[in-house]
Amino acid sequence: RGNHDNPAYFDGTTFKHKRMRCVPDYTVLQVCNHNILCVGGAISIDRKIRMEAWNKKKVKYGFDSNLSDGIPRAYYWSDESLVYDEKKMDAIRSAYSIDIVITHTAPSCCELQTKSGLTRWAVDDPALLMDVQTERFTMDQLLQRLQADKHPITHWYYGHFHQSWHVVMDGILYRMLDIMEFCMVY
């Protein structure tokens, strides 16, 4: 679940097809002898502009963002960011041995490290820098919990930053995937 994806779609049933499924956060997929933890969400650095554009569209076309199917439409969702869920991590600890993690954003040890583009957006969004810092802290919590619970993590995949990068740290291959970049997991 990326930051520009409607969280309502990720309930495990709204989009469930033979080869593609939108799963809820903290879902563990058991595929090809791997236990894959999926945790989505991230901060949109352009959230202020997205909210303003959606409000203009609603006024111009005279519609509400909640249509008859009950799925909200918008350019920004206030619940887009990731949430650390202690209870779900407790359940995962007792039921699985996680070896692959897929998230939208990444722990603070990973790229992107620079905030050069971020400061430009923060001029009109004073809470942005703190929210992004909190987001990285939340990802660090997730990583630390997985390590404390002795999960044998070998791979961590993420996107969000629209670039490609990888590194091995502490036995984990962290791989940032660019838009439309795919990779094989063995």
For each predicted feature, which ranges?
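Conserved hydrophobic/aromatic beta-strand scaffold that supports enzyme active sites
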Residues: 28, 38, 102, 182-183
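Active-site neighborhood of phospho(di)ester-bond hydrolases with catalytic His/Asp-centered motifs
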Residues: 1-4, 23-24, 39, 100-104, ...
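Short, glycine/charged-enriched secondary-structure capping and boundary segments
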Residues: 13-16, 51-53, 115-118, 170-173
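Active-site-proximal loop/helix segment associated with metal-binding centers of metalloenzymes
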Residues: 34-137
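Binuclear metal-dependent phosphoesterase catalytic core
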Residues: 30-32, 140-149, 161-186
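Core catalytic region of metal-dependent phosphoesterases/phosphodiesterases
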Residues: 1-32, 120-123, 127-138, 148-149, ...
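Short catalytic/ligand-binding loop motif for oxyanion handling, primarily in non-cytosolic enzymes
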Residues: 7-10, 29-32, 44-48, 108-113, ...
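Adenosine-cofactor binding site in Rossmann-like domains, unifying the SAM/SAH pocket
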Residues: 27, 77-81, 178-180
